[in-house]
Amino acid sequence: MKAAPVFLITRKPEPWRPQNNGGMSFTPAVLPINATEFKVACSNCNLRELCLPVGGLSEPELERLDLLVASRRALRRGELLFRSGDPFESLYAVRTGFFKTRVSSKDGRDQVTGFQMAGELLGLDGIGADRHTCDAVALEDSQVCIIPYGQLEALSREFSELQRQFHKIMSREIVRDHGVMLLLGSMRAEERLAAFLLNLVQRLHARGFSQSELVLRMTREEIGSYLGLKLETVSRTFSRFQEEGFLEVKQRDI
């Protein structure tokens, strides 16, 4: 079976299919929110309970948070949201699209450290050292809401519920890291890939997608980098899953 650059696990048209931009580079666009044209606010966002859960905030508190999240940024596929070493200023809530985070070794090799989808936060890596420790790259045309961290921190000191929710987000990241350590330290290749696919299904299902269909925006090489597997091993494992009837591969569809 030939290695495809991207896998899709779906049998129906999917609005998140990557666009081919011909390798062109684009200047980042930071767009101010215009309430009369396209209101983007935490209080009316259908991803708010996934991104920064604010269900316990009062109406006035939500309005303060809406003022804080006052801009968004559009990125093309392959564009960097931030890179390792950049000053840490903001968190980024993924509104649409898909990202990967990666770190580079001294010999120039890239290691994928995570994949982020709509409703998840990017930039938490920069809190400790006031600089980002990884690159964040858009895997498809994407959009993020910009959350200035200093202002969020100040607002959290005023609103205990917001502070509590932010602590829960940090805890969730720690639990995720523990899960990755378990994945890499004790599982065979088949178990790693199966756990990876199931995790994506669960996260997408929380966003309203089917539990039996999945879209992969990353290449097999990127999956292998994340799972600590060689490209050939990832390809063989996908082939084995298909032979055993666990999934069906048809070009970009699985």
Spell out what each predicted region is.
Residues 80-86:
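Short phosphate-coordinating micro-motif centered on Lys-Gly-acidic
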Residues 157-230:
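Polybasic "coupling" helices that flank or enter modular domains
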Residues 112-179:
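Cyclic-nucleotide recognition modules
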Residues 78, 89-102, 118-119:
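Glycine- and acidic-residue-biased ligand/ion/polar-headgroup-sensing regions
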Residues 245:
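Glycine-centered, phosphate/nucleic-acid-interacting loop/turn motifs that mediate DNA/RNA or nucleotide
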Residues 22-77, 121-122, 126-128:
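Cyclic nucleotide-binding regulatory module and flanking cytosolic helices
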Residues 250-254:
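Short, Lys/Arg-rich nucleic-acid/phosphate-binding segment
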